[in-house]
């Protein structure tokens, strides 16, 4: 099974609140967002994205891959060496619909803050591109470190509050991640 299907889109919940779906290994991927078409990290296999403390989420218009680590990685190889629980590392995000990448990053950030209290930091492992810089800075992250192969941006709760002072009053309701 290569995971190409429209079933993921049909399982999505369209609400004004968060619209997030966890893509499990056995789940079909949205056809128009297939993992092999990842423009950020095309070299990463489906297996890599779903093993060793890693998850994939979608909102139907974007995909984000998250690794749970115990420190801030500087390379993709570090994602294997730093498996842990207290750092959520957004290591690839891409979108085929304008605005959906931003929505997914912010909604997943909020969701993890509310449901995974052990996560202390929300950091990216980003390519060293102007596009990545613009995306993360414009979405409220700060440049944490510049590395040889990557840049790390950090999303902090204080920045989320500036962007949306009432974020903590949101109810998950029908938006529970499946």
Where are these regions (language model features)?
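Conserved acyl-donor/pantetheine-binding loop and adjacent beta-alpha core of acyl/acetyltransferases
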Residues: 59-89
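Conserved catalytic-core motifs of GNAT/GCN5-like acyltransferases
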Residues: 142-156
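Short, high-confidence coil segments that cap the C-terminus of an alpha-helix
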Residues: 85, 117-119
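Conserved beta-strand-loop-alpha-helix junction that forms the acyl-donor binding cleft
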Residues: 95, 122-134
């Amino acid at each position: 099974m290569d995971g190409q299907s429209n079933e993921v889109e049909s399982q999505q919940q369209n609400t004004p609140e968060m619209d997030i779906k966890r893509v499990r290994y056995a789940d079909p991927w949205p056809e128009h967002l297939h993992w092999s078409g990842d423009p950020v990290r095309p070299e990463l296999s489906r297996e890599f994205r779903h093993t060793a403390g890693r998850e994939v989420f979608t909102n139907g218009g974007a995909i984000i891959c998250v690794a749970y680590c115990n420190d801030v990685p500087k390379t993709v190889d570090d994602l294997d060496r730093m498996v842990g629980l207290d750092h959520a590392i957004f290591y690839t995000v891409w979108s085929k619909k304008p605005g959906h990448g931003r929505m997914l990053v912010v909604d997943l950030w909020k969701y993890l803050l509310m449901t995974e209290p052990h996560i202390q930091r929300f950091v990216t492992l980003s390519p060293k591109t102007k596009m990545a810089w613009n995306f993360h800075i414009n979405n409220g992250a700060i440049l944490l470190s510049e590395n040889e192969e990557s840049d790390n941006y950090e999303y902090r709760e204080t920045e989320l509050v500036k962007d949306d002072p009432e974020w903590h009053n949101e109810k998950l309701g029908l938006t529970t991640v499946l």
